[in-house]
Amino acid sequence: MSTNGVMEKGFVTTSLDSVINWGRTGSMWPMTFGLACCAVEMMQAGASRYDLDRFGIVFRPSPRQSDVMIVAGTLCNKMAPALRKVYDQMAEPRWVISMGSCANGGGYYHYSYSVVRGCDRIVPVDIYVPGCPPTAEALLYGIIQLQNKIHRTNTIAR
């Protein structure tokens, strides 16, 4: 959290936006939307080696308790309405991470009749994590980039 003022007589001045965004970045709760092999790497990121809990990231089973959705894997036309429904059930503010080349743009199955060519055609995506499948480190880097994006937003002006 950045301080905009100087410390005088035991207090620090800062903006309310900075405090709210600091709280949001320290308690991101992702809704997992694992569709293919990228979901295995997402599960690995939550395991003890990478331990996303230390960043305040706790996977939630319900979209109503989540503020981040991680779309991992190939999105088919049949699954697209379910993705949109889960996204609409999430409370504002909400963010989406697209994980893997299949979620980003269709991947190997780009020319298949049943594959959506990127989940950004269904929901707005904030962070794209490339790779097939992306490593747990790449997902962790994407989450850190999302935290940086949240720090830069104006919360109260929305």
UniProtKB/Swiss-Prot annotation:
Its EC number is 7.1.1.-. It catalyses: a quinone + NADH + 5 H(+)(in) = a quinol + NAD(+) + 4 H(+)(out). GO terms for molecular function: 4 iron, 4 sulfur cluster binding; iron ion binding; NADH dehydrogenase (ubiquinone) activity; NADH:ubiquinone reductase (non-electrogenic) activity; quinone binding. It is an enzyme of class 7 (translocase). Disulfide bonds: none annotated. One of its GO terms (biological process) is electron transport coupled proton transport. InterPro entries: NADH_UbQ_OxRdtase-like_20kDa, NADH_UQ_OxRdtase_20Kd_su. NDH-1 is composed of 14 different subunits. Subunits NuoB, C, D, E, F, and G constitute the peripheral sector of the complex. NDH-1 shuttles electrons from NADH, via FMN and iron-sulfur (Fe-S) centers, to quinones in the respiratory chain. Couples the redox reaction to proton translocation (for every two electrons transferred, four hydrogen ions are translocated across the cytoplasmic membrane), and thus conserves the redox energy in a proton gradient. This is NADH-quinone oxidoreductase subunit B 2.
